[in-house]
């Protein structure tokens, strides 16, 4: 089992249990989307000493936690679980890391992104996103979801997509390769 040096920030104890099946890592649980100042202080300390990986559920609450931590603790790494990998096996459950397979968790942790601390460059233009069919049209949402999976950056809406691409400095070559794969699969 692979040992992870950084501390992985997750939402709850069920996420910690599921991670233990996939990797050897220490975790810190936020216990919900309302992160306390004490928890943020712990994350800052851990970032300075060991590094931190934010690995939250692929839903609204998970994204909220991710943004809160990113704003308070610059330079953390991010792992994104594809939405379809976090679907519960039983009806009525919520989307989350606790439902992911060990293989899906290992894949997400193998494709980490680190935020740019200084002002990142915009490498992919608004025009590029329109040309790729990611902002308008009947299949735009589906294409964004698939692009997010391919690039390992999670799902975002059309308004957030340029920000996420810029934040993680996705290179144009990687972006267009992923778009080409989408186009090929649609044919």
Swiss-Prot record:
Reactions catalysed according to its record: Endonucleolytic cleavage of RNA, removing 21 and 42 nucleotides, respectively, from the 5'- and 3'-termini of a 5S-rRNA precursor
InterPro entries, sorted: RNase_M5 (IPR004466), RNase_M5_C (IPR025156), TOPRIM_dom (IPR006171), TOPRIM_RNase_M5-like (IPR034141)
SUPFAM superfamilies per record: Toprim domain
Note accompanying the cofactor annotation: Binds two Mg(2+) per subunit.
UniProtKB keywords: Cytoplasm, Endonuclease, Hydrolase, Magnesium, Metal-binding, Nuclease, Ribosome biogenesis, RNA-binding, rRNA processing, rRNA-binding
TM stretches of this protein: none
Enzyme class, first EC level, given as a word: hydrolase
GO CC terms, sorted: cytoplasm
UniProt name for this protein: Ribonuclease M5
Organism whose genome encodes this protein: Lactiplantibacillus plantarum (strain ATCC BAA-793 / NCIMB 8826 / WCFS1) (Lactobacillus plantarum)
Upper lineage: Bacteria, Bacillati, Bacillota, Bacilli, Lactobacillales
């Amino acid at each position: 089992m692979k040992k992870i040096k950084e501390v992985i920030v997750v939402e709850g104890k069920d996420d910690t249990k599921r991670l233990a099946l996939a990797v050897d890592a220490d975790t810190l649980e936020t216990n919900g989307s309302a992160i306390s100042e004490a928890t943020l202080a712990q994350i800052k300390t851990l970032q300075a000493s060991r590094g931190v990986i934010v690995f939250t559920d692929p839903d609204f609450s998970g994204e909220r936690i991710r943004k809160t931590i990113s704003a308070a603790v610059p330079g953390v790494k991010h792992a994104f679980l594809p939405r379809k990998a976090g679907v519960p096996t039983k009806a009525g459950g919520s989307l989350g890391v606790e439902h992911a397979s060990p293989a899906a968790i290992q894949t997400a942790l193998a494709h980490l992104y680190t935020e740019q601390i200084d002002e990142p460059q915009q490498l992919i233009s608004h025009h590029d996103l329109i040309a790729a069919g990611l902002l308008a049209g009947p299949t735009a949402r589906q294409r964004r979801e698939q692009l997010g999976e391919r690039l390992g950056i999670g799902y975002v809406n059309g308004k957030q997509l340029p920000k996420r691409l810029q934040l993680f400095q996705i290179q144009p070559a990687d972006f267009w390769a992923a778009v080409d794969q989408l186009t090929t699969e649609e044919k």
